[in-house]
Amino acid sequence: MLFSPRLTTCLVLFLSVLLPCAQAAPRKIIIDTDPGTDDAMAIMLALNSPELDVRAITVVPGNVIAKQGLDNALRMLSLANRCDIPLAAGAQHPLFQKLITAEFWHGKNGLANIELPPSKCKVDARWAPDLIIELLHASPHEITLVPIGPLTNIALAVEKDPSIVPLAKELILMGGSISGGNSTAVAEANIYGDPEAAQIVFQAGWPLTMVGLDVGDKTLLSRKHLAQLGKTHGPVNDFIYKVAEFLIQLGEKFGDSGTPMYDPLAVGVAIDASIVTAPLMHVDVETRGEFTRGQTVANRRNANEKNVLHHFPDGDRYIVEGLEKVEPNAKVCTEVNAEKFLELFVSRIQGK
């Protein structure tokens, strides 16, 4: 069939307008969570974002015990009318150490003491690490893991089936810091909650982005944003408003002007990676230090001194003979466009 030059020109113009508007396929993600307050904000952000396709939610102990976290996740899925998403229970405790919970920061039930209605949703019968393994094999190179709690479930999945590592598209985790901690002087809470699991995950070899305190502490949801959330209403909007209000009030007791959006920011990076700057670094997790257990130790220059042993009449010593390259294993978020993310968060919770 032949087209006239005029018709061809019209078709080209039509397609030039249409094609940029075509939406990319939503990114498939699995959220692994210890459902506390900022987890709640992260989950609702993910469920309200058309860029994301939440394939499963798995629960790990951390902010609250595993049973409470599972109940919280069930109620949130029901509130959002998303019982179609598989929800699975996982580990009941860290790999080696005793569980550390944080009701002080999250309320007695982990959800700012807000009593959500009983859930209509059901728990998936599969164990969380098994569900993660199954979904990665079913959709190779398509699913991004977004763990926003201790990394116990992810480590258990890797230990059970190392072949999942190349099957994951990416892993975007909330955790760690290269500039000091919040659980201790050097350790961030999610990594401190299970350092051995974190070391397994960091050394596994997949594309990994660390969304830590370095950017989370710069991303504060303030009373200005709370006022914006208060302009609209709905089950999810009203719930997140109350959670945010609880966290802001808690932060004000310590002189903070807002609440850090730790977990939601990891979901934000899954939506739009351009909101952060994330140079490549080699990251290890300290598992033995008396004062440094749980620290994420980042090699910013990806090199170590090369020390060579030499023998001398007066004794042996090492001499520095240049540098040895260390392969980076993570993108480490160091800068963030906080206002861009906060505008995104508020608009999505409002259903815009």
Model-derived features: positions:
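Bacterial N-terminal signal peptides that target proteins for export
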Residues: 1-11
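A residue-level signal for conserved active-site and pocket-lining positions in enzyme catalytic cores
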Residues: 87, 201, 267
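Conformational coupling and interaction surfaces
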Residues: 25-27, 44-45, 53-54, 192, ...
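Structural signal for hydrophobic packing residues in well-ordered secondary-structure cores
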Residues: 77-81, 136, 140, 205, ...
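Metal-dependent C-N hydrolase catalytic cores
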Residues: 27-29, 70-138, 320, 325-332, ...
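Bacterial N-terminal signal peptides
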Residues: 9-20
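Active-site histidine-anchored catalytic micro-motif
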Residues: 25-33, 37-75, 109, 115-218, ...
